[in-house]
């Protein structure tokens, strides 16, 4: 059994090494310009950030550089992921390689941009001014950067949902009917995921969950275009979902 898995493990190791190497090279480049990146990151907050420990400046530079390196490396990471998956697919299924890499990278960047320009400015302003009549907000640079990177990367990953739906529908694993049948269960999972990948505050979780619900709806439309379910199968999925609900109650 191990001998059968060995080629796959070797291939996985190869793809991971390329991905990690790409991130490392990008990290070294980003670290050289970390101050410029920090100014870009801090642009959404008009207050003053403070340093609480001697090594905090170094930690901030490392966090910012590493997060920027991940964003820059996403096309290579998606390419390596595809090269690992592709050998197990049929020839017609391999035709999704360009959409997978292009839209995967694009949706990640779109999610990060949505977080940076729309979500993060509102959240940081709200949280920083909440209770401002009672106490002054002295936010450390390290906590600010951690909050920022977690939100940005979280939204980047979350926006991959339509890409995943396209890929799974293309290979025939899901249909629009199967996604619609389990919509209410998906809502619960979405809020759980939002609680995991966002900072631990309700505002961030709601701002993450609402776009995810919209992306789930978009995924249904994508699945309908790529792999629509026959009418009979759609009714079967709805009946299965209803029976599952009854059994739980």
Swiss-Prot record:
Family in the record: Belongs to the TatC family.
User: Which cellular component terms (GO) are annotated to the entry?
Assistant: TAT protein transport complex
Q: Which molecular function term from Gene Ontology is one that the record holds?
A: proton motive force dependent protein transmembrane transporter activity
The membrane topology noted for this protein in its Swiss-Prot or TrEMBL record is: Multi-pass membrane protein
- Major localization listed first in the record, in broad terms: membrane
Matching entries from InterPro entries are given as: Sec-indep_translocase_CS, TatC
Where it sits in the cell: the answer is: Cell inner membrane
Subunit structure comment from the entry: The Tat system comprises two distinct complexes: a TatABC complex, containing multiple copies of TatA, TatB and TatC subunits, and a separate TatA complex, containing only TatA subunits. Substrates initially bind to the TatABC complex, which probably triggers association of the separate TatA complex to form the active translocon.
Q: Which UniProt keywords apply?
A: Cell inner membrane, Cell membrane, Membrane, Protein transport, Translocation, Transmembrane, Transmembrane helix, Transport
* Protein name, as recorded: Sec-independent protein translocase protein TatC
Q: NCBIfam families, alphabetically? A: tatC
Q: Which BP terms in the Gene Ontology apply to this protein? A: intracellular protein transmembrane transport; protein transport by the Tat complex
Q: What does this protein do?
A: Part of the twin-arginine translocation (Tat) system that transports large folded proteins containing a characteristic twin-arginine motif in their signal peptide across membranes. Together with TatB, TatC is part of a receptor directly interacting with Tat signal peptides.
The residue ranges crossing the membrane are: 18-38, 69-89, 96-116, 151-171, 187-207, 208-228
């Amino acid at each position: 059994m191990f001998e059968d898995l060995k080629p796959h493990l070797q291939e996985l190791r190869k793809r991971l090494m390329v991905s990690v190497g790409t991130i490392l090279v990008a990290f070294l480049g980003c670290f050289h310009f970390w101050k410029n990146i920090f100014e870009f990151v801090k642009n959404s907050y008009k207050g003053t950030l403070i340093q609480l420990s001697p090594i905090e400046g170094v930690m901030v530079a490392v966090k910012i550089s590493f997060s920027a390196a991940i964003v820059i490396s996403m096309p290579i990471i998606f390419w390596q992921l595809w090269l690992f998956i592709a050998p197990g697919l049929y020839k017609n299924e391999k035709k999704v390689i360009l959409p997978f890499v292009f839209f995967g990278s694009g949706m990640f960047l779109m999610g990060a941009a949505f977080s940076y320009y729309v979500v993060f400015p509102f959240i940081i302003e709200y949280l920083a001014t909440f209770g401002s009549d009672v106490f002054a907000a002295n936010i450390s640079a390290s906590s600010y950067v951690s909050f920022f990177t977690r939100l940005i990367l979280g939204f980047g990953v979350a926006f991959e949902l339509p890409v995943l739906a396209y890929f799974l529908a293309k290979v025939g694993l899901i249909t629009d009917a199967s996604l619609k049948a389990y919509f209410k269960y998906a809502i619960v999972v979405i809020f759980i995921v939002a609680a995991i990948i966002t900072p631990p505050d309700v505002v961030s979780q709601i701002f993450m969950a609402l776009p995810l619900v919209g992306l789930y709806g978009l995924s249904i439309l994508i699945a309908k275009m790529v792999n629509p379910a026959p009418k009979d199968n759609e009714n079967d999925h709805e009946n299965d979902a209803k029976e599952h609900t009854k059994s739980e109650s």
